[in-house]
Amino acid sequence: MGDQRPRDRPRSPGMDCKPWYCDKPPSKYIAKRKHRRLRFPPMDTQNWVFVKESMDSFHYGCPSPEDMLICRLNEFLLPKISHRGPQADPKSRQKKLLKKVALFSKLLPAQPAWKAFVEEAQLMAKHPLAMYPNLGEDMPPDLLLQMLKLLDPERKLEKAWAYCEGREKTIKEPTKPEPPKAPVSHHFLEPPKIRASCLKELLQEDTPSTTECVSDSLQHRYTSRKMHDFKWARDMGVDEESIRNLFDFTPKWRATYEDQQIKKIKEWVSELQYRIKLDEMDEVESSQEKDWDRKLQMAPNSYTAQCVKMRYGVWYLKPKLGKKLRSDQPLIDPKLLLEKPDEPDILDDLYGPIAFKDFILSKGYEMPGIIERLCARKGWTYDSVKTPVQRAMRLYK
Protein backbone atom coordinates (compact mmCIF):
# COMPACT_ATOMS: atom_id res chain seq x y z
CA MET A 1 0.00 0.00 0.00
CA GLY A 2 2.90 2.28 0.80
CA ASP A 3 4.39 1.83 -2.69
CA GLN A 4 1.19 2.76 -4.44
CA ARG A 5 1.14 6.38 -5.63
CA PRO A 6 -1.96 8.31 -6.51
CA ARG A 7 -2.47 8.44 -10.28
CA ASP A 8 -4.62 11.53 -10.38
CA ARG A 9 -2.56 14.20 -8.68
CA PRO A 10 -3.48 17.85 -8.89
CA ARG A 11 -1.36 19.58 -11.61
CA SER A 12 -0.45 23.18 -12.03
CA PRO A 13 -2.17 25.07 -14.85
CA GLY A 14 1.06 25.24 -16.89
CA MET A 15 1.60 21.49 -16.96
CA ASP A 16 -1.33 20.78 -19.30
CA CYS A 17 0.38 22.40 -22.35
CA LYS A 18 2.46 20.50 -24.93
CA PRO A 19 6.25 20.27 -24.63
CA TRP A 20 8.42 22.87 -26.38
CA TYR A 21 9.60 20.61 -29.19
CA CYS A 22 6.01 19.96 -30.23
CA ASP A 23 5.30 23.67 -30.63
CA LYS A 24 8.22 24.09 -33.07
CA PRO A 25 7.00 24.09 -36.71
CA PRO A 26 8.50 21.64 -39.18
CA SER A 27 11.62 22.73 -41.03
CA LYS A 28 11.34 24.61 -44.31
CA TYR A 29 13.65 22.16 -46.04
CA ILE A 30 11.07 19.37 -45.80
CA ALA A 31 8.35 21.64 -47.17
CA LYS A 32 10.50 22.65 -50.14
CA ARG A 33 11.45 19.07 -50.82
CA LYS A 34 7.84 18.20 -51.51
CA HIS A 35 7.64 20.66 -54.41
CA ARG A 36 11.06 19.68 -55.73
CA ARG A 37 11.24 18.30 -59.25
CA LEU A 38 11.61 14.54 -59.31
CA ARG A 39 14.72 12.99 -60.79
CA PHE A 40 12.77 10.58 -63.00
CA PRO A 41 9.73 12.28 -64.59
CA PRO A 42 6.60 10.23 -65.20
CA MET A 43 6.59 8.18 -68.39
CA ASP A 44 4.92 9.73 -71.40
CA THR A 45 3.00 7.12 -73.41
CA GLN A 46 3.17 9.24 -76.56
CA ASN A 47 6.88 8.48 -76.98
CA TRP A 48 6.58 4.71 -76.69
CA VAL A 49 8.17 2.75 -79.52
CA PHE A 50 7.78 -0.99 -80.01
CA VAL A 51 10.85 -2.78 -81.38
CA LYS A 52 11.74 -6.29 -82.49
CA GLU A 53 13.56 -8.77 -80.33
CA SER A 54 16.84 -8.40 -82.23
CA MET A 55 16.69 -4.62 -82.15
CA ASP A 56 16.66 -4.17 -78.40
CA SER A 57 20.49 -4.28 -78.25
CA PHE A 58 22.21 -0.85 -78.37
CA HIS A 59 25.82 -2.06 -78.51
CA TYR A 60 26.32 -0.68 -82.02
CA GLY A 61 24.32 2.54 -81.78
CA CYS A 62 20.65 3.33 -81.95
CA PRO A 63 18.45 1.07 -84.08
CA SER A 64 17.08 2.36 -87.33
CA PRO A 65 13.56 3.82 -87.18
CA GLU A 66 12.34 1.44 -89.93
CA ASP A 67 10.64 -1.93 -89.40
CA MET A 68 9.37 -1.22 -85.92
CA LEU A 69 6.96 -3.94 -84.89
CA ILE A 70 5.24 -5.16 -81.74
CA CYS A 71 7.02 -8.00 -79.97
CA ARG A 72 5.48 -11.47 -79.73
CA LEU A 73 2.89 -12.07 -77.07
CA ASN A 74 4.21 -15.47 -76.00
CA GLU A 75 7.55 -13.99 -74.91
CA PHE A 76 6.68 -10.54 -73.55
CA LEU A 77 3.52 -9.36 -71.95
CA LEU A 78 4.55 -5.68 -71.78
CA PRO A 79 6.11 -3.53 -74.48
CA LYS A 80 9.73 -2.29 -74.29
CA ILE A 81 9.91 1.48 -73.93
CA SER A 82 12.51 3.83 -75.41
CA HIS A 83 12.55 7.51 -74.47
CA ARG A 84 13.15 8.74 -78.00
CA GLY A 85 10.84 11.32 -79.52
CA PRO A 86 9.21 11.14 -82.91
CA GLN A 87 11.85 10.58 -85.58
CA ALA A 88 12.23 13.08 -88.42
CA ASP A 89 12.78 12.38 -92.10
CA PRO A 90 16.31 11.32 -93.13
CA LYS A 91 16.70 14.32 -95.49
CA SER A 92 15.89 16.91 -92.84
CA ARG A 93 18.14 15.04 -90.41
CA GLN A 94 21.07 15.32 -92.85
CA LYS A 95 20.51 19.08 -93.17
CA LYS A 96 20.67 19.51 -89.40
CA LEU A 97 23.88 17.48 -89.23
CA LEU A 98 25.49 19.61 -91.93
CA LYS A 99 24.63 22.78 -90.01
CA LYS A 100 26.20 21.40 -86.83
CA VAL A 101 29.33 20.33 -88.68
CA ALA A 102 29.66 23.81 -90.17
CA LEU A 103 29.39 25.39 -86.72
CA PHE A 104 31.97 23.14 -85.08
CA SER A 105 34.44 23.12 -87.99
CA LYS A 106 37.72 25.00 -87.64
CA LEU A 107 37.43 26.83 -90.99
CA LEU A 108 34.53 29.11 -91.77
CA PRO A 109 32.79 28.65 -95.14
CA ALA A 110 34.23 31.97 -96.41
CA GLN A 111 37.82 31.10 -95.51
CA PRO A 112 38.52 28.55 -98.29
CA ALA A 113 37.21 30.99 -100.89
CA TRP A 114 39.44 33.75 -99.50
CA LYS A 115 42.41 31.38 -99.49
CA ALA A 116 41.89 30.56 -103.16
CA PHE A 117 41.57 34.27 -104.01
CA VAL A 118 44.85 35.08 -102.25
CA GLU A 119 46.68 32.31 -104.10
CA GLU A 120 45.42 33.62 -107.44
CA ALA A 121 46.49 37.17 -106.56
CA GLN A 122 49.96 35.97 -105.61
CA LEU A 123 50.32 34.19 -108.93
CA MET A 124 49.26 37.32 -110.81
CA ALA A 125 51.60 39.61 -108.83
CA LYS A 126 55.04 40.39 -110.17
CA HIS A 127 58.13 38.80 -108.76
CA PRO A 128 60.06 41.05 -106.30
CA LEU A 129 63.19 40.84 -108.45
CA ALA A 130 61.28 41.82 -111.60
CA MET A 131 61.37 45.48 -110.51
CA TYR A 132 65.15 45.56 -110.98
CA PRO A 133 65.94 44.53 -114.59
CA ASN A 134 69.59 45.70 -114.40
CA LEU A 135 70.32 43.84 -111.19
CA GLY A 136 72.90 41.54 -112.76
CA GLU A 137 75.03 44.42 -114.02
CA ASP A 138 75.33 46.15 -110.62
CA MET A 139 75.93 43.03 -108.48
CA PRO A 140 78.65 40.39 -108.65
CA PRO A 141 77.47 37.02 -110.02
CA ASP A 142 78.23 35.10 -106.80
CA LEU A 143 76.03 37.37 -104.70
CA LEU A 144 73.33 37.40 -107.37
CA LEU A 145 73.28 33.60 -107.45
CA GLN A 146 72.83 33.40 -103.67
CA MET A 147 69.97 35.90 -103.85
CA LEU A 148 68.26 33.97 -106.63
CA LYS A 149 68.46 30.74 -104.64
CA LEU A 150 66.65 32.41 -101.75
CA LEU A 151 64.09 34.57 -103.57
CA ASP A 152 63.50 32.63 -106.79
CA PRO A 153 63.70 28.88 -106.10
CA GLU A 154 61.19 28.18 -108.91
CA ARG A 155 63.55 29.70 -111.54
CA LYS A 156 61.05 32.19 -112.95
CA LEU A 157 63.77 34.68 -113.90
CA GLU A 158 65.37 32.62 -116.63
CA LYS A 159 67.71 35.34 -117.89
CA ALA A 160 69.28 35.94 -114.48
CA TRP A 161 69.73 32.21 -113.87
CA ALA A 162 71.32 31.73 -117.29
CA TYR A 163 73.63 34.70 -116.70
CA CYS A 164 74.80 33.34 -113.32
CA GLU A 165 75.21 29.75 -114.48
CA GLY A 166 77.10 30.80 -117.61
CA ARG A 167 79.35 33.00 -115.51
CA GLU A 168 80.09 30.11 -113.15
CA LYS A 169 81.06 27.83 -116.04
CA THR A 170 83.47 30.39 -117.46
CA ILE A 171 85.05 30.89 -114.03
CA LYS A 172 85.41 27.16 -113.35
CA GLU A 173 86.79 26.29 -116.82
CA PRO A 174 88.91 29.21 -118.09
CA THR A 175 89.85 28.61 -121.72
CA LYS A 176 92.36 31.46 -121.97
CA PRO A 177 94.53 33.08 -119.28
CA GLU A 178 93.01 36.33 -118.10
CA PRO A 179 94.99 39.52 -118.75
CA PRO A 180 96.38 41.39 -115.73
CA LYS A 181 93.79 43.63 -114.14
CA ALA A 182 94.27 47.38 -114.33
CA PRO A 183 94.75 49.27 -111.05
CA VAL A 184 91.33 50.18 -109.70
CA SER A 185 90.84 53.48 -107.86
CA HIS A 186 89.96 53.19 -104.18
CA HIS A 187 87.05 55.59 -104.29
CA PHE A 188 84.00 55.14 -102.11
CA LEU A 189 85.69 52.72 -99.74
CA GLU A 190 85.64 52.77 -95.95
CA PRO A 191 88.68 54.49 -94.40
CA PRO A 192 91.20 51.98 -93.03
CA LYS A 193 92.04 52.05 -89.34
CA ILE A 194 95.43 53.68 -88.77
CA ARG A 195 97.22 52.47 -85.69
CA ALA A 196 98.47 54.81 -83.00
CA SER A 197 102.11 53.90 -83.73
CA CYS A 198 101.81 55.08 -87.35
CA LEU A 199 100.23 58.36 -86.30
CA LYS A 200 102.93 58.84 -83.69
CA GLU A 201 105.62 58.58 -86.34
CA LEU A 202 103.79 61.08 -88.52
CA LEU A 203 103.35 63.62 -85.70
CA GLN A 204 106.92 63.45 -84.38
CA GLU A 205 108.48 64.94 -87.53
CA ASP A 206 106.51 67.65 -89.33
CA THR A 207 108.69 67.64 -92.43
CA PRO A 208 107.29 68.63 -95.84
CA SER A 209 107.97 65.15 -97.24
CA THR A 210 105.82 63.45 -94.62
CA THR A 211 102.99 65.94 -94.97
CA GLU A 212 102.97 65.48 -98.74
CA CYS A 213 102.83 61.69 -98.36
CA VAL A 214 99.96 61.91 -95.91
CA SER A 215 97.98 64.32 -98.09
CA ASP A 216 98.57 62.16 -101.18
CA SER A 217 97.43 59.01 -99.38
CA LEU A 218 94.33 60.73 -98.01
CA GLN A 219 93.52 62.23 -101.40
CA HIS A 220 93.97 58.85 -103.01
CA ARG A 221 91.83 56.94 -100.49
CA TYR A 222 89.09 59.35 -99.50
CA THR A 223 86.91 61.61 -101.59
CA SER A 224 84.70 64.47 -100.59
CA ARG A 225 80.98 64.18 -100.28
CA LYS A 226 80.57 66.40 -103.33
CA MET A 227 82.05 63.71 -105.59
CA HIS A 228 79.42 61.31 -104.31
CA ASP A 229 76.68 63.83 -105.13
CA PHE A 230 77.97 64.26 -108.71
CA LYS A 231 77.96 60.56 -109.48
CA TRP A 232 75.29 61.12 -112.14
CA ALA A 233 77.71 63.36 -114.08
CA ARG A 234 80.34 60.62 -114.18
CA ASP A 235 77.73 58.18 -115.54
CA MET A 236 77.02 60.60 -118.38
CA GLY A 237 80.67 60.50 -119.45
CA VAL A 238 82.09 63.62 -117.81
CA ASP A 239 85.74 63.37 -116.78
CA GLU A 240 86.32 62.90 -113.05
CA GLU A 241 89.38 65.18 -112.89
CA SER A 242 87.46 68.10 -114.40
CA ILE A 243 84.83 67.81 -111.65
CA ARG A 244 87.52 67.58 -108.96
CA ASN A 245 89.23 70.76 -110.19
CA LEU A 246 85.99 72.71 -109.86
CA PHE A 247 85.75 72.07 -106.10
CA ASP A 248 88.18 72.11 -103.20
CA PHE A 249 89.32 68.80 -101.83
CA THR A 250 88.22 68.55 -98.17
CA PRO A 251 88.62 64.98 -96.95
CA LYS A 252 86.83 64.04 -93.76
CA TRP A 253 88.27 61.53 -91.39
CA ARG A 254 87.20 60.63 -87.86
CA ALA A 255 89.68 59.43 -85.29
CA THR A 256 89.05 56.02 -83.77
CA TYR A 257 89.45 54.96 -80.16
CA GLU A 258 92.74 53.27 -80.96
CA ASP A 259 94.33 56.60 -81.88
CA GLN A 260 93.38 58.32 -78.61
CA GLN A 261 96.00 57.95 -75.91
CA ILE A 262 97.78 60.03 -73.27
CA LYS A 263 100.75 61.89 -74.74
CA LYS A 264 103.62 63.71 -73.14
CA ILE A 265 104.36 67.41 -73.61
CA LYS A 266 107.24 66.64 -75.95
CA GLU A 267 104.92 64.76 -78.31
CA TRP A 268 102.54 67.71 -78.69
CA VAL A 269 102.51 69.94 -81.74
CA SER A 270 104.62 73.10 -81.46
CA GLU A 271 101.50 75.32 -81.65
CA LEU A 272 100.02 73.73 -78.55
CA GLN A 273 103.17 74.09 -76.45
CA TYR A 274 102.84 77.89 -76.32
CA ARG A 275 99.42 77.66 -74.66
CA ILE A 276 100.51 75.64 -71.62
CA LYS A 277 100.28 78.61 -69.19
CA LEU A 278 97.19 80.69 -68.49
CA ASP A 279 96.78 84.35 -69.37
CA GLU A 280 96.20 87.01 -66.74
CA MET A 281 92.46 87.09 -67.36
CA ASP A 282 92.24 83.31 -67.25
CA GLU A 283 94.12 83.26 -63.93
CA VAL A 284 91.75 85.84 -62.44
CA GLU A 285 88.71 83.86 -63.59
CA SER A 286 90.08 80.59 -62.24
CA SER A 287 90.90 82.19 -58.86
CA GLN A 288 87.40 83.64 -58.62
CA GLU A 289 85.89 80.28 -59.41
CA LYS A 290 87.90 78.65 -56.61
CA ASP A 291 86.81 81.30 -54.08
CA TRP A 292 83.22 80.93 -55.19
CA ASP A 293 83.41 77.16 -54.78
CA ARG A 294 84.70 77.62 -51.25
CA LYS A 295 81.79 79.91 -50.41
CA LEU A 296 79.35 77.40 -51.77
CA GLN A 297 80.68 74.77 -49.42
CA MET A 298 78.34 74.77 -46.43
CA ALA A 299 79.82 75.31 -43.00
CA PRO A 300 79.45 72.49 -40.48
CA ASN A 301 76.19 72.57 -38.58
CA SER A 302 77.27 73.76 -35.11
CA TYR A 303 73.72 74.44 -33.89
CA THR A 304 72.30 71.94 -31.43
CA ALA A 305 68.62 72.02 -30.58
CA GLN A 306 67.84 72.63 -26.90
CA CYS A 307 64.78 71.41 -25.09
CA VAL A 308 62.43 74.23 -23.95
CA LYS A 309 59.60 73.70 -21.47
CA MET A 310 56.24 75.26 -22.32
CA ARG A 311 53.06 75.84 -20.29
CA TYR A 312 49.49 76.85 -21.06
CA GLY A 313 48.39 78.57 -17.85
CA VAL A 314 47.09 77.42 -14.49
CA TRP A 315 45.62 73.98 -14.26
CA TYR A 316 42.36 75.06 -12.57
CA LEU A 317 41.40 77.43 -15.39
CA LYS A 318 39.88 76.52 -18.71
CA PRO A 319 42.41 75.73 -21.43
CA LYS A 320 40.85 78.37 -23.69
CA LEU A 321 41.70 81.05 -21.13
CA GLY A 322 45.38 80.12 -21.15
CA LYS A 323 48.04 80.96 -23.68
CA LYS A 324 51.12 79.08 -24.79
CA LEU A 325 54.10 80.48 -22.87
CA ARG A 326 57.55 79.43 -21.93
CA SER A 327 58.12 78.22 -18.38
CA ASP A 328 60.27 81.24 -17.46
CA GLN A 329 57.69 83.80 -18.69
CA PRO A 330 55.07 85.21 -16.26
CA LEU A 331 51.45 84.22 -16.59
CA ILE A 332 48.94 86.55 -18.23
CA ASP A 333 45.72 87.51 -16.53
CA PRO A 334 42.86 85.57 -18.19
CA LYS A 335 40.58 88.61 -17.96
CA LEU A 336 42.86 90.52 -20.30
CA LEU A 337 42.70 87.69 -22.76
CA LEU A 338 38.90 87.71 -22.70
CA GLU A 339 38.78 91.40 -23.57
CA LYS A 340 38.77 91.89 -27.31
CA PRO A 341 41.52 94.25 -28.41
CA ASP A 342 40.61 97.23 -30.55
CA GLU A 343 41.07 96.77 -34.24
CA PRO A 344 44.13 98.77 -35.34
CA ASP A 345 43.42 101.66 -37.65
CA ILE A 346 45.56 101.79 -40.75
CA LEU A 347 45.72 105.59 -40.62
CA ASP A 348 47.35 105.56 -37.17
CA ASP A 349 50.66 104.42 -38.62
CA LEU A 350 50.66 106.88 -41.52
CA TYR A 351 53.60 109.07 -40.57
CA GLY A 352 54.26 110.07 -44.16
CA PRO A 353 51.12 112.23 -44.68
CA ILE A 354 51.82 114.20 -41.49
CA ALA A 355 55.39 114.91 -42.53
CA PHE A 356 54.16 115.91 -45.99
CA LYS A 357 51.72 118.36 -44.35
CA ASP A 358 54.50 120.09 -42.43
CA PHE A 359 56.65 120.27 -45.55
CA ILE A 360 53.86 121.96 -47.54
CA LEU A 361 53.14 124.47 -44.76
CA SER A 362 56.82 125.35 -44.43
CA LYS A 363 56.97 126.17 -48.15
CA GLY A 364 53.85 128.37 -47.95
CA TYR A 365 51.59 126.24 -50.16
CA GLU A 366 47.95 125.39 -49.51
CA MET A 367 47.04 122.13 -47.82
CA PRO A 368 45.65 119.39 -50.12
CA GLY A 369 42.05 118.48 -49.52
CA ILE A 370 42.82 114.80 -48.84
CA ILE A 371 45.15 115.63 -45.95
CA GLU A 372 42.66 118.15 -44.51
CA ARG A 373 39.95 115.49 -44.41
CA LEU A 374 42.36 113.07 -42.78
CA CYS A 375 43.30 115.56 -40.05
CA ALA A 376 39.64 116.46 -39.45
CA ARG A 377 38.71 112.82 -39.16
CA LYS A 378 41.45 112.06 -36.63
CA GLY A 379 40.92 115.35 -34.75
CA TRP A 380 44.43 116.62 -35.36
CA THR A 381 45.58 120.19 -35.47
CA TYR A 382 48.66 121.56 -37.10
CA ASP A 383 50.27 122.41 -33.78
CA SER A 384 49.39 119.25 -31.85
CA VAL A 385 51.08 116.85 -34.25
CA LYS A 386 54.71 117.75 -34.70
CA THR A 387 57.28 116.07 -36.85
CA PRO A 388 61.04 116.49 -37.20
CA VAL A 389 60.50 118.17 -40.57
CA GLN A 390 60.14 121.60 -38.97
CA ARG A 391 63.44 121.29 -37.11
CA ALA A 392 65.19 120.00 -40.23
CA MET A 393 63.91 122.93 -42.28
CA ARG A 394 65.28 125.40 -39.76
CA LEU A 395 68.74 123.85 -39.90
CA TYR A 396 68.98 123.84 -43.70
CA LYS A 397 67.64 127.42 -44.20
From Swiss-Prot:
> From what superkingdom does this record's organism come?
Eukaryota
Q: Which family does it belong to?
A: Belongs to the FAM47 family.
Please identify the protein, giving its name as recorded: Putative protein FAM47D
What does the organism's lineage look like at the top?
Eukaryota, Metazoa, Chordata, Craniata, Vertebrata
Which gene holds the coding sequence for this protein? FAM47DP
